[in-house]
């Protein structure tokens, strides 16, 4: 069997790498993606919002019956389509992320193959796919993977415009603008800023920037961008007027970048350094080696190494300078980091499996265990279990003195749960009067000072977990 595999590799290394990459993509990006509940907060509320699109106008997002105008719609459209095709299940909600991630993996392979060889393309695609960031965020249905995929395709296509024949350049540039346009519908202005900065700097350095502004490419691109983006933005403006301009563009585009205090997401300048180090495991040590080699060996003289260095620095640098920071923001920096790391490993080739790799693999397992622990001890699993328990009983569900949790809506489907958002004993008494047989979910930390403590003393404690408790009325 081993001899046949070796012979197949010898006869057709390209096919061997593609088949192996397909198998690894299936294992890393698809297997088990529906085996665990949705993670609060974004994944669960985005899933509910996507499901609700199936019942009203697809232009207008709603969250708990309130207009949600801070995000563009593409992620929600894709997820809603998957839910319509496959039902409202965890795997259906996450499937689009896995598909987009897999396309990005194979696109990365072909770019790497074009630059050096099929082996280099495989190394790069494997590094990009098999790290904590990419695996974890492919398996969580949030906007970042959609944006990362479209941004990566846009930048790759910008690179391909240098390789294709003149007769095919118009198609390549058109594809570039189409991906950028849909990226704008996924994340907004960053889908324009990043490709223009990266491709623009690269073209300036290589003295070929004039091609970008040729009318047959640039004007066609502008028309494509407007055709794709005007309908939704116009519909939103007609529906919500100046409020849409303020919330969508000013507050969540510009304010988020320069004044994140208003959104509670401000972080220090170097915030992403440890975040990316952990997220890029098990390749982080090799990436550091690649950075050292970049300066020590003056690798910036290589056209493509310089391109991916610019690619990484622009994304990592701009996100670091922004006032608002979340760990997932820096996911788009993984593809260029994979290329730079692949260069480093490709040059070492058979010598690369040494101490740093073993240390990195160990660190990755530790990181994954920690991340899994954070997710499953953060309360989401408790809400899922409590909601399912109430769903399978004859009891009505009430949540008390806690924010709206989409995980409850996803798993309690008999009717609408009563949501009491603050510590209001009168509202609790009224809910218990209306529903004689009820179960109540409450945060443990809120119980000691609750004004409804006497009411809870007359209820039965069904389950007490790390973050939440479940009570029920006594017959």
Feature annotation, model-predicted:
Residues 345-370:
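Signature aromatic-anchored transmembrane alpha helix within multi-pass, membrane-resident enzymes
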Residues 26, 367-474:
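Short periplasmic/luminal acceptor-recognition loop of GT-C membrane glycosyltransferases, typified by
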